[in-house]
Amino acid sequence: MNIALLGFGTVGKAFYELTLGRSDLRVTSVLSRRPRPELPCTVTNDFDEIVRDRSVGIVVEVMGGLEPAYRYICAAMRAGKHVVTANKQLVCAHYDELLELARECGVSLRCTAAAGGGIPWLTSLSRAARLDEITAVGGILNGTTNYMLSAMTTSGVDYTTCLREAQALGYAEADPTADVEGYDARRKLVLSANLAFGASVREEEIPCFGISSVEEKDFAAWRELGRVCKLFVRAERHEGRISAFVCPTLFPAASPVAQTNGTGNLVTLRGARFGELSFFGAGAGGYPTGSSVLSDCVDVIEGCPSFYVSRHEAKHIDNSAVAGRFYLRTGSETVCTGPIIVAEAFARAERALSCGEPVFLARIEEE
């Protein structure tokens, strides 16, 4: 099947290389803003040319951002072309609409690379959801912050220096906001919760606290507690309600989560009958992400359904019944709370922030 590739950055290049030599999939056109004389295929800056090309069966979108990616993939589906995307921001923002459009047009929409990098997380999660009731998902789903927290834990380097190192290595973007504030991880949690629970949840309803305010004294305090900090996502379903939040979390130093270092991702699902299943792998990088894009393309030519799940019921996030202990540092005190409702923990942090205080919030995982 012929593929049109939208975007030729790190992931786009890796995906292109992974398709070379295959007889079942061929990149025949690339959408690029500049000429690419090194490529033997058609290179164009006119997307309409791709839409009109009836020989193109799959459009692979690795441009990122909301526009023009949204307009492009909608036009591709309306033209009867399957779509594979790594764009978590886009799929989260237009989840219901894109699923319905794929069904109406009789095409496949796949986004495995949008969560988990090289881990086949979304495909594994959707298969598990067909076998059992999934009651919880959670894990480390952002390679940038995991690299930074790992480095700060082991070497004692400060946040600013560590961020610069991550940017120099290509692990962090020039504007790292989406990663360090937890927004990237939250979007991956939205996709995970939607597939696990057959739901449609809104990103803005999920409370989120990132790592940008972490300080060296926090790591010193955690060492005394025998804990290691990870940016962790979690969502649970109980009696029809869905709870979800993103927050730095303190794990016992010997636990598998605490031992997941570098850009690695570790994510777990819990089934009502089969218990917990965990997945570990590279959470970022051209080839790991490109391999997930390629896997989606193979699924398309093998006749996968239009999307991972057949239903998506709108659900509101309800954290009112979820409690835990928290580490809270403000300008005036550092405390480890007793069990409190998650919503109250985030509210305390927000109140301190509104007063202009420096704040760091982390959940303390029970042993």
Language-model features: where?
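A conserved regulatory-domain signal marking ACT and ACT-like small-molecule sensing domains
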Residues: 297-299, 303-367
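Rossmann-fold NAD(P)-binding glycine/threonine-rich loop
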Residues: 70-75, 88-127
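Oxidoreductase and adenylate-handling cofactor-binding alpha/beta cores
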Residues: 119-134, 145-157, 187-201, 296
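Glycine-rich adenosine-cofactor-binding loop
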Residues: 2-17
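Substrate-binding/catalytic subdomain of NAD(P)-dependent oxidoreductase enzymes
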Residues: 161-259, 264-266, 285
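Catalytic, metal-anchored helix/loop core of enzyme active sites in primary metabolism
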Residues: 134-138, 146-149, 153, 165, ...
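Rossmann-fold NAD(P) dinucleotide-binding segment
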Residues: 45-86
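NAD(P)-binding Rossmann-fold cofactor-contacting core
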Residues: 21-39
